[in-house]
Swiss-Prot record:
Name of the featured protein: UPF0235 protein ESA_00387
Transmembrane segments annotated in the record for this chain: none
Organism: Cronobacter sakazakii (strain ATCC BAA-894)
SUPFAM superfamilies: YggU-like
One Gene Ontology term, aspect cellular component: cytoplasm
Alphabetized Pfam families for the sequence: DUF167
Gene3D superfamilies: YggU-like
Family: Belongs to the UPF0235 family.
Amino acid sequence: MSAVSKTVDGLVLRLYIQPKASRDSIIGLHGDELKVAITAPPVDGQANAHLVKYLAKQFRVAKSQVVIEKGELGRHKQVKIIEPQQIPTEVAAVTD
């Protein structure tokens, strides 16, 4: 499976998360995953909440349309974006 896959109702992203970064950004490919740096620390779900908010902003969707399918407690996550309104250039570059 590639880092970004299209589904009937949106996209599935395989992510590698770097918490406590200096700024939020989609960095690019990291092996077979997309690396995303976020400023939130990995404490009490703060990183997951921040990731959902950041991805919702990047794809111009509601936070409820960003679903963490796998990896709730780890750095490796699978996230589904339902009906994205915009595709960030870093994601479009690796979309299959």
